[in-house]
C-alpha cells in the first residue's frame, strides 16, 4: 500500500497553482487578511495592473472587475501555458530575477502572490507616482517542519547580494527594508504562521512536487526512505503538522 500511495502521488499533475486536489488530503489555514479580497478591492479602482509571477493566473482570473490594462509575468513554462489560457495573451515570459519588460511608470497597481524573487527596483520603476504594490510573500521558515524532516536541519536562509532584491523565505524586516530602499513607502505589513496538516504521504509527495523549493531536487526515489518513515507515522499517529509563514505588504511609490 505504501508503494501505491507513492505511485499515486507521483502521477498527479502539478502544473499551475490550483490546489483543489488537496481537498480531503491536506489542509492549510488561510491568512486573516484575505489577499484575494484585497486584490479585488484595489483592482476595481486601478487603471493599469501588473501581476508579477502570476503562476497559472488563477488568482488574477478570479478578480471580478479588472482595470482596462492588465499584464502579467511568469517564468516557469508549464505555468505559462496555463496562465495564458486563464488570462489571454497578456502574460510575458520573464525570468524571476530579470528586468520587467514594461516602460517606466506604466502601472498604478503591481501585485504578486508568493513571488520567488522580487526586484524592488523594478517594481518601483514600473509604478506610477502614487502607484501601489500589494503582495503576499512567503516568510522565513515556511514549511520548515517538513523540509527538516526530509533533509535534516536547515541553517540560515537565502539572502540576496543585491539590497534591492528579496527571495521567497525572506524575513519581514528584510522585506520591508528592501521595499523602502527602492523608494517605496510601506503602508501595511502583516505576518502570520499558519497550521498545515497532511493526512497521507500521497499529499506530501504531491506538495513537494508542486512547491519545488520546499525540498530542492525532490524525487520520490531519492527520498523514499524518509517517505516510508513518514507514511508509517501518519498511519499510526495521524496527520503530519507543519506551519507556513505568510506576509502581506502594501506600499506606495
What annotation goes with each model-predicted range?
Residues 47-100:
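Class I SAM-dependent methyltransferase SAM/SAH-binding core
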Residues 120, 130-195, 215-220:
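Conserved catalytic/acceptor-binding region of the Class I
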